[in-house]
């Protein structure tokens, strides 16, 4: 009986001790797993927060030259803009300094435009010689009586008629008046012809 009781007690103790041992081991394993997981998580967070450094760009000489040219162009454009702004500011300051002065009405001299007469334009007009001037020159100067120094015009000048005989008066023509004049002249000519024809017929014959 006593042996049986001792075996039962040992069995009771063994599972308790084994359970205790199993619990400690499990706790250790769980803590190790947690530590491992936390280490992984921390490494992941570190890798996520701090990205790896980017590799340096490989730039050739053309890229460097283009960058330098662009920088120089920017500087030149900025200098030009600064120069323009300075000139504009100087011009504005100069314009602001010169204030136009408006004269008073008393200082302005009143001009009477009514009394002023415009001067006639001086235009040189070539004077046309009249027949009288030509006749006078032809009669006075003997040089005009010869043409080209060889042809003598004295016979022609002696036969020239005066101006009042050659020149006709300007008379306005009326159709009715012209018709009556022409018809009367024609009738008078016809009458003269008729009388000439009838004259020898009506005369008596001489024996």
UniProtKB/Swiss-Prot annotation:
Keywords in alphabetical order, please: Acetylation, Cell projection, Cilium biogenesis/degradation, Cytoplasm, Cytoskeleton, Phosphoprotein
Report which superkingdom the organism of origin falls in: Eukaryota
Q: Where in the cell is it found?
A: Cytoplasm, Cytoskeleton; Cell projection, Cilium
One of its GO biological process terms is: intraciliary retrograde transport
Which Pfam families does the UniProt record give?
Answer: IFT43 (PF15305)
Q: Output the InterPro entries linked to this UniProt entry.
A: IFT43
Compositionally biased, Basic and acidic residues: which spans?
Answer: 75-95
Location of region: Disordered: 1-97
How this chain assembles, per its entry, is: Component of the IFT complex A (IFT-A) complex. IFT-A complex is divided into a core subcomplex composed of IFT122:IFT140:WDR19 which is associated with TULP3 and a peripheral subcomplex composed of IFT43:WDR35:TTC21B. Interacts directy with IFT122, WDR35 and TTC21B.
Q: Name one GO cellular component term.
A: cytoplasm
Q: Which family does it belong to?
A: Belongs to the IFT43 family.
Q: Which residues carry this modification: Phosphoserine?
A: 77
Protein name stated in the entry: Intraflagellar transport protein 43 homolog
Q: Which residues carry this modification: N-acetylmethionine?
A: 1
Biased composition annotated in UniProt, kind: Polar residues? 28-46
Annotated source species = Bos taurus
Q: Which PANTHER family match?
A: INTRAFLAGELLAR TRANSPORT PROTEIN 43 HOMOLOG
Q: Does the keyword Phosphoprotein apply?
A: yes
Job of this protein: As a component of IFT complex A (IFT-A), a complex required for retrograde ciliary transport and entry into cilia of G protein-coupled receptors (GPCRs), it is involved in ciliogenesis. Involved in retrograde ciliary transport along microtubules from the ciliary tip to the base.
């Amino acid at each position: 009986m006593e042996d049986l009781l001792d075996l039962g007690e040992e069995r009771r103790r063994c599972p308790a001790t084994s359970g205790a041992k199993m619990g400690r081991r499990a706790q250790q394993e769980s803590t190790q797993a947690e530590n491992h997981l936390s280490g992984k998580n921390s490494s992941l967070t570190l890798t996520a927060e701090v990205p790896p450094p980017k590799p340096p760009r490989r730039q050739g000489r053309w890229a460097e030259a283009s960058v330098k040219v662009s920088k120089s162009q920017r500087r030149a454009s900025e200098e030009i803009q600064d120069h323009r702004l300075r000139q504009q500011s100087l011009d504005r300051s100069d314009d602001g300094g010169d204030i136009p002065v408006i004269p008073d009405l008393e200082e302005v001299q009143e001009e009477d435009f009514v009394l002023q007469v415009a001067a006639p334009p001086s235009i040189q007009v070539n004077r046309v010689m009249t027949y009288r001037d030509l006749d006078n020159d032809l009669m006075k100067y003997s040089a005009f009586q010869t043409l080209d120094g060889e042809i003598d015009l004295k016979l022609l000048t002696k036969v020239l008629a005066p101006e009042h005989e050659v020149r006709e008066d300007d008379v306005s023509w009326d159709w009715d008046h012209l018709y009556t004049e022409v018809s009367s002249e024609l009738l008078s000519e016809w009458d003269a012809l008729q009388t000439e024809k009838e004259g020898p017929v009506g005369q008596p014959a001489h024996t």
